[in-house]
Amino acid sequence: TGFMGKIQDRFATYGVERDFEQMVQVASTVKGCSGLEVVYPQQVQDPVKAQEILKKYGMGVAALNVNVKGEPKWLYGSVSSPDAKVRAEAVEYMKTGLDYAAVLGCNKVTIAFLNDGSDYPFEFDFERAFNDAVACVREAAAYRPDVRLSLEYKPSEPRVHCFLNNAGKMAYFCEKVGLDNVGVTL
């Protein structure tokens, strides 16, 4: 994976800060690179303008990542948040991401629910969180069956325990969602 701009984890900041066009321009100089995974909403707020920039540099989009982890509102989860308003906003983010992906000419949206989990035992109601998350993903994916939603699992970070933290749980989760356009990023 190559990041074309600034990235930050909980320990440090890496790379040079670049706007979207600068990142696309740098990526276009990499031999063999013809497409990018772009991030909504941090990198792409206007898919038509983004498409013009990509075309200018001869680049495409392989996938659009919907970021439901990097803002304070997602602190207690997105699709599993105990707050129905936060869950509804996560669904809207996913729907917007699906629309943007279609405009950008790709048929895949990636998402990792990294703030959906816990730091301490018994911190949240797992059954409620799981069922709420299934309902949210089902609603978003049903909105655009022509675009695939690829869900990424991760054991931890930023949570000590992400609740969809391995391939088995994520495969079961996708089975419960029950839609052909929902799968697992391996």
Where are the language model's segments positioned?
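N-terminal pre-domain/capping segments
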Residues: T1-T96, A102, L179
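Active-site acidic/histidine proton-transfer and metal-coordination neighborhood
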Residues: K56, G60, Y76-G183
